[in-house]
Amino acid sequence: FRCLNSTWPEFDVEGRSGAALPTTEWLLHAIWQRLDPQLPLKSLRLYEQSTLWADYLGNSMEAFLTIRSHFAAAHRLAREELSQSENEAIYGKCARPHGHGHNYLLDVTVRGEIHPRTGMLCDLSALQQLVDDQVVEPFDHTFLNKDVPFFSTCVPTAENIALHIADRLKAPVAELGASLHKIRLQESPNNAAEIYAEAAQV
């Protein structure tokens, strides 16, 4: 193991004017700068841990930061105006009257400029707290159809849940100085929904 602050000139804040702090975002940018002259790079991803990573596409100081959270919830896929047989024809077993549950994995990706002083796109602790307050706490261990008012009139498919999460997060993320880029909600090993917030105009 090596300390980046002392072994990479880019992060020698004591000995070099203009050096940066070795945040995940800045480290990814520095790696790009080192590799770009030798490789035709399109994108780079750097994991700090399994629940936090950054992406860089070579666009000046713009980068993407993703945090992963999870929650457990139950739901039933059915429209009230349809019969049980009609709902089962559309949603299959997911329309059964008493619902079923999932352990959801939630990836929240924000986009922004790497700040020259902090080396971050936004306050990471504030972003995590925002996701906890706006999504995890209100959704965890609930029956979405009955416990989350939005889903009393909207079928809680993975797509609709992801869209609602994007709607809840877009404005608060902007207040942190970043833009909500993407929501990825994994419902099961073979089923996930992705919402690109800017394209969806939530």
Region spans (language model):
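Charge-rich, low-complexity N-terminal segments
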Residues: F1-V202
